[in-house]
Regions:
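Aromatic-anchored segments of alpha-helical transmembrane domains
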Residues: 61-63, 131-137, 204-215
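N-terminal transmembrane-helix/juxtamembrane module of multi-pass inner/ER membrane proteins
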Residues: 29-105, 151, 160, 258-259
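Hydrophobic, membrane-inserted alpha-helices
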Residues: 104-108, 181-186, 205-212
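Interfacial helix-loop-helix junctions of multi-pass membrane proteins
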Residues: 169-172, 208-234
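Membrane-interface loops
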Residues: 69-83, 113-197, 245-259
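C-terminal membrane module of polytopic membrane proteins
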Residues: 220, 226-259
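Short, positively charged and aromatic/hydrophobic N-terminal segments
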Residues: 13-26
Length: 259
């Protein structure tokens, strides 16, 4: 009689092989349930159009911020620091605000991309132009600066050294920290249903971020207004020119191709 088991298991009894089958069945079922839970979580977190815009912009930001760092070391770099920058002291403790900004952006972006489709499409189009303008500034104004020597042994100094070790003194003007923080606050200001306290919190946090980027010597003063302008101009244009129509046009084109 021909065995129903695979060749490697010809000499394994059912009592030995059976539990393995049950284990694989249970494991497969758990993986399937885990996949369903992840899908349900994603749907509850953001609508489909919100995920589409978020993932596209996140990928574009990575493409803008990291690949051009390969070219910048070979370009003639500019020092945009002024006498006022030299008077700003180095304060390692401000690295906490600098790092907490990433969590603040994540929370705010979730709130923004949960809004109505018109709102999401308009803000996404504005952020798209913001990223393109930022990339143009990075290439046309290849600014750099000299980091201070961090010799402290305290916790904050260790964090600063960690940031310096994974970063490079390029892509400075405008400050992406200021760009993202201002964009988040500005979009919250025009969004309905956002608690007033959270809008005020984001404005205060924006001011703290502007201070942190110069106190930890990641940027110079001119990078701050540059970041505000690069964020504000696209938002004004998007609202006046109704750039949400771009999102609707792309959605309609995708729908027609899917038919």
């Amino acid at each position: 009689m021909k065995s129903c088991f695979p060749t490697p298991f010809l000499h394994v009894s059912f009592l030995e092989y059976g539990p393995l089958l049950w284990y694989n069945t249970i494991l497969t079922g758990e993986k399937r349930d885990m996949g369903k839970r992840i899908v349900n979580w994603a749907r509850n977190l953001l609508p489909g159009y919100g995920w589409a815009c978020f993932l596209f912009l996140a990928a574009l930001q990575l493409l803008i911020f990291y690949p051009n760092r390969l070219l910048l070391p070979y370009m003639n770099k500019l020092d945009l620091s002024t006498v006022w920058d030299a008077r700003i002291p180095f304060r390692p403790a401000w690295i906490v605000i600098y790092l907490l900004s990433f969590a603040s952006w994540a929370i705010t972006f979730v709130l923004l991309f949960r809004q109505r489709k018109e709102h999401v499409y308009r803000n996404s189009a504005a952020y798209l132009l913001t990223l393109l303008m930022t990339f143009a500034c990075f290439m046309l104004i290849p600014a750099t600066l000299e980091w201070p020597e961090v010799t402290g042994k305290d916790f904050f100094s260790c964090l600063v050294r960690l940031v310096y070790s994974v970063d490079q003194p390029y892509n400075l003007c405008p400050s992406l920290h200021v760009v993202c923080s201002y964009y988040c606050w500005r979009c919250l200001y025009d969004t309905e249903g956002i608690p007033r306290w959270y809008r005020h919190f984001n404005f205060v946090f924006l001011l703290l971020v502007c201070c942190s980027v110069v106190f930890v010597k990641q940027h110079v003063l001119v990078d701050i207004p540059a970041g505000i302008l690069v964020s504000e101009i696209p938002l004004l244009l998007a609202k006046r020119l109704r750039w949400e129509r771009l999102g609707y046009a792309i959605e309609e084109r995708i729908r027609k191709k899917g038919q």
